Amino acid sequence: MMAHCAGCERPILDRFLLNVLDRAWHVKCVQCCECKCNLTEKCFSREGKLYCKTDFFRRFGTKCAGCSLGISPSDLVRKARNKVFHLNCFTCMVCNKQLSTGEELYIIDENKFVCKEDYISASSLKESSLNSVSSCTDRSLSPDIQDPIQDESKETDHSTSSDKETANNENEEQNSGTKRRGPRTTIKAKQLETLKAAFIATPKPTRHIREQLAQETGLNMRVIQVWFQNRRSKERRMKQLSALGARRHAFFRSPRRMRPLGGRLDESEILSSGPYSYYGDYQGDYYGSGNYDFFPHGPPSSQTQSPADSSYLQNSGPGSTPLGPLESQLSGHHPSENQRYVDMISHPDTPSPEPGMTGPLHPISGEVFTGGPSPPFSMSNNSGFSGPLPHQNLDINEATVW
């Protein structure tokens, strides 16, 4: 029976053949699938494909945790926390000194290292800078700085020295922008969505939940803890600002309801409040009989009047103000009940009052002018001026009443 090649599946007619993985091959078919070089002495196989030594370790060999490149079997390596590093990659990130076996070091973000000397010097420098900043800063005026510290006091967590390094770096970023900054952690969009969803579910996660988030996102537990502290602090600040804005809105909002421009005033509102409140206090009967219709702004001077009533006749002209009477005040008589006369200043040609022209007025019933009982008292405008009465062809001396 003729043998078939495992590579090209054709019958082998050559004088010589190669036996690889218990199968027959053409000599020319035994080659690396990556670089296409002929394999004569040794080959490596994965998933039915043949590789040379270089390409096999490049693709499937252990990779350096520092540079993410493959590690060949002949390279010298160092291990830290179940991760393998090249000798050149296993260095201090501050002084770039190559770390040797047995030396104490501090690990940051699982793949960065700081030697003991640099860590101690950096910690002492940060403590001195923090003390100088706290001595010149009023803590009572900075709630943004107090909130994360209060959270840390409530959620004290035993962490490694690398966690302390991250916390000191973040405090240094908040307090002094000119100092040397430590390594910053960049949170990707997918990681941020996971953290936000966890914050909505539990704003204060336990250590077990933080460990699960660290496994899901690949972030350090200290980074996750600080993120939750900052997020809670931000939520509190937003609530304080919203509450302060609501109080300011309630304080500056006008408590009085504004009247629409087209609305009509009620007589009770006019007589009870405002600059004409003395009308509501008057106890006399202005409008009992029809003889007072000729005096729309008040009773004749024969009745007993209060000081507010007497001042109204003096101040109710178009040329006067509510604060003071006209220069030429009106003068009235005080006759008996049957004779109500008053000397009014008038002029037949002009509505403005001019002194020196007077005429007597006789009491006339309101039915002469209106054909019925006298209407109730009402104001025509804010100044109290009601205008002249309609002229009638009567045998009396008429005058405009102000």
Curated annotation (Swiss-Prot):
> What's the superkingdom here?
Eukaryota
> Where does the record place Polar residues bias?
300-319
For bias type Basic and acidic residues, the affected ranges are 151-167
List, alphabetically, the SMART domains matched.
HOX, LIM
Q: Which residues form a coiled coil?
A: none
Residues of the region (Disordered) are 133-187, 291-335, 365-392
**Record-annotated LIM zinc-binding domain positions:** 3-61, 62-125
Its subcellular locations are: Nucleus
Q: Name one Pfam family in it.
A: LIM
Q: Name the Gene Ontology molecular function terms of this record.
A: DNA-binding transcription factor activity, RNA polymerase II-specific; RNA polymerase II transcription regulatory region sequence-specific DNA binding; transcription coregulator binding; zinc ion binding
Instruction: List the GO terms this entry assigns under cellular component, sorted alphabetically.
Output: nucleus
The cross-references to Gene3D superfamilies, in alphabetical order and at most eight, read: Cysteine Rich Protein, Homeodomain-like
Identify the main location.
Answer: nucleus
Question: One GO BP annotation here?
Answer: regulation of transcription by RNA polymerase II
Which keywords annotate this record? Developmental protein, DNA-binding, Homeobox, LIM domain, Metal-binding, Nucleus, Repeat, Transcription, Transcription regulation, Zinc
Checking CDD domains in the record gives: homeodomain, LIM1_Lhx1_Lhx5, LIM2_Lhx1_Lhx5
Q: Which residues bind DNA?
A: 180-239
InterPro entries reported for this sequence: HD (IPR001356), Homeobox_CS (IPR017970), Homeodomain-like_sf (IPR009057), Lhx1/5_LIM1 (IPR049618), Lhx1/5_LIM2 (IPR049619), LIM_Homeobox_TF (IPR050453), Znf_LIM (IPR001781)
Q: PANTHER family, from UniProt?
A: LIM/HOMEOBOX PROTEIN LHX, LIM_HOMEOBOX PROTEIN LHX5
Query: What interactions and quaternary structure are annotated?
Result: Interacts with ldb1 and with the N-terminus of rnf12.
Explain the purpose of this protein.
Probably involved in the patterning of the nervous system, in particular in the early specification of the diencephalon.
Its protein name is LIM/homeobox protein Lhx5
